[in-house]
Amino acid sequence: MLYTDDSLLAGPDNGEIEQIIKDLKKAKLNITDEGDIQDFLGVNIDTREDGSIHLSQPHLIDQILKDLKFPADGKGNVATKVTPAKSSEILKRDKDGREFDGSFNYRSIIGKLNYLEKCTRSDIAYIAHQCARFTEEPKDCHAKAIKWLARYLRHTKDQGLILKPQKNRGVEVYVDADFSGNWDPEAPHKDRDTARSRHGYIIMYEGCPMIWKSQLQTEIALSSTESEYIGISYALREVIPIMELLREMKKENFPIFKTKPKLHCKLFEDNSGALEMAKTHKYRPRTKHLNVKLHHFRDYVTRGEISLHKVGTKEQLADYLTKPVLLEILLYLRLKVMGW
């Protein structure tokens, strides 16, 4: 027996898709054809006249606002926030801080924010992950950060991710890291995670974001170069399987591709030291302690399947995944990555 739910079929034209559905029905499979896709797993899908696709989740944002007891649109006095978080705020455990009053289900809100971030809203990835770190023992400062984020989401509820493929671009990945960004020199003993760095990366195909992540590193980096190199390694763990999948699809002549998929990956990083480490196999006394697992991608670089490129800090699209950024930077990166 085989049961499936919410399945998608994609093809170069509707005729082939309709034929597949007919063949499956002939095989006595109970299938309901819902027609052209408009909604999938809570994500609104709007195909526009210019060929772009707009993905958004306004209903989930409405649910978050309801859970926080925020008034509906146009009602009540709710201050608007134009950034997901305060640009100067770094959340910590704050063990001696004011207790959270329990006015909303913190864990439930975090679950909704995580789903929203992973599907359509990379602009909230950093602060959503930061708030999620304190789910077991949330404090008042963490609840305030969630409410700030909710006011930003209320202001941008109908926005999401705009996909507009650019045929001249293949697989690209932007990697950035914030070295020991949570470090609290006044109380390092209160939160051992403050010594950890955070990396973020965005994986794109034809200019469209596919995967993004904001992640606290498990290893303690000893320098900014190390933290960036760790970020490169983790990002390419996700990129390499994508490249292998594209290679198989190209080999099998998959009809879903109107043009042959590009198998080369460009990686963009703003740290020259990390790029040099990624390119060379030479023994280096200062980096010999790095785990061998971090070097897994070097053969791909040697073969030319992955090329490494220096990018300026302003053009580092993953910057807003590693720390709170100023409004001017947010607007620029959000337009570049999300299309609005």
Q: Which positions does each model-derived feature cover?
A:
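Short, conserved secondary-structure transition motifs
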Residues: 31-58, 88-89, 269-273
